[in-house]
């Protein structure tokens, strides 16, 4: 009986030609058959949005496949929609069977703290998780097009193998963020490969974005705006958070769940209605 190799579905929000997704495919190519379905262009900030009023198209990128890897086990497709559209389209139209794992990334820029809520790469991962497929997002704190992803290789390979072997709890995916290495972050005894101090499983930090809009004036007489903003970590000294881990040279792994219910607030909110609605 033929033993089928695992099937990995990979997407991102930086576009199918981004360096991060190309290197991710190369890093995990020996773990199974790979289908890439990613946006035609950058779709950062699209979170879990999907296209309800726009027709979608898929394009097989044969030349990219041969340029990316000389492997017949890799298919690369682009979609004109959002990152979540890419996952939905791949599951409905491309994948020959249910994927064993969905991977988002590698994202150019971190998705820690509240940034995870805006991230299209996290949208990919949450969509996979909602389909009960073990899903992981990988991001690097470096927005440059030519970012160096090589230091991420050992841990990405280790985590991919672990998730393929053991799966993840139902309704839980992983948000994995790598710090940008600096000379002061030298490897420590017991640290992980790539020069990181180690790995911390941590919670999402509370943070806020301010000064988010910049107004400009066009020479033709009308105003326009750019979304920019400045992020502030509201708890910089909290050592159990993803931002603290990244700021101190650790890889931050945040288990993230589909269930958004604030269970700790249910009793308090229920009290509002006891007198008139009991």
List where the protein language model places each region.
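Short, glycine-rich nucleotide/cofactor-binding loops
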Residues: 10-17, 115-116
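Hydrophobic/aromatic beta-strand patches that form the interior of the parallel beta-sheet core
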Residues: 35-37, 77, 103, 136-138, ...
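Short acidic, Gly/Ser-rich segments with clustered Asp/Glu that frequently serve as metal-coordination loops
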Residues: 14-22, 219, 228
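Glycine/threonine-rich flexible loop motifs
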Residues: 110-119
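Glycine-rich phosphate/pyrophosphate-binding loops
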Residues: 129-151
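Alpha-helix C-terminal capping segments
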Residues: 90-96, 123-134
